[in-house]
């Protein structure tokens, strides 16, 4: 994987815009409304295995990425239009778009750095174990490996 620059960073993904390889530039929607009231559990269980497509090739561009930050644990994007290829939608989080964010990462699934407004800073290796420090979205706080403390 090379550098991935896209809309919607995810701690365990390290910049979902890259989608594995190459450089992908995403056009963020003009406005995404985050839910005003969110029921975030004190302990959010991260999926044991993140849904990762077997395809390792990078698409030319990322159109839109809807992502969820659930109780300070950042899950996989729920919907992603990647050129003509759609990312898997079978994720553990509901398909609700969180606050706008910019993801910058090395590689696609598994490891890298994700930095953005609304999701904050995420650093993780493998999909589930990830250190996520974020502000905005569903919750604020610190989460590690799917377990985190957060408030909204």
Curated annotation (Swiss-Prot):
Q: Which UniProt keywords apply?
A: Cuticle, Repeat
sequence repeat residue numbers: 27-30, 33-37, 39-42, 86-89, 92-95, 98-101, 127-130
Q: Where is the signal peptide?
A: none
Cysteine-cysteine disulfides: none
Give GO terms: molecular function aspect only.
Answer: structural constituent of cuticle
- For whether the record's keyword set contains Repeat, the answer is yes
What job does this protein perform?
A: Component of the cuticle of migratory locust which contains more than 100 different structural proteins.
Q: What is known of its domains?
A: The tetrapeptide (A-A-P-[AV]) repeats found throughout the protein are also present in many proteins constituting the protective envelope of other species.
- What is the recorded name of this protein? Cuticle protein 64
Which organism does this sequence originate in? Locusta migratoria
């Amino acid at each position: 994987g090379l550098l991935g620059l896209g809309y919607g960073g995810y701690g365990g993904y390290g910049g979902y815009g890259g989608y594995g390889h190459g450089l992908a530039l995403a056009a963020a929607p003009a406005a995404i409304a985050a839910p005003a009231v969110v029921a975030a559990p004190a302990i959010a269980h991260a999926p044991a295995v993140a849904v990762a497509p077997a395809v390792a090739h990078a698409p030319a561009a990322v159109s839109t990425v809807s992502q969820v930050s659930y109780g300070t644990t950042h899950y996989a994007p729920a919907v992603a239009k990647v050129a003509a290829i759609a990312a898997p939608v079978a994720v553990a989080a509901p398909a609700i778009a969180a606050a706008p964010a910019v993801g910058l990462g090395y590689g696609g699934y598994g490891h890298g750095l994700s930095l953005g407004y609304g999701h904050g800073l995420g650093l993780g290796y493998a999909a589930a174990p990830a250190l996520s420090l974020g502000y905005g979205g569903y919750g604020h706080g610190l989460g590690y490996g799917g377990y985190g403390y957060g408030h909204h």
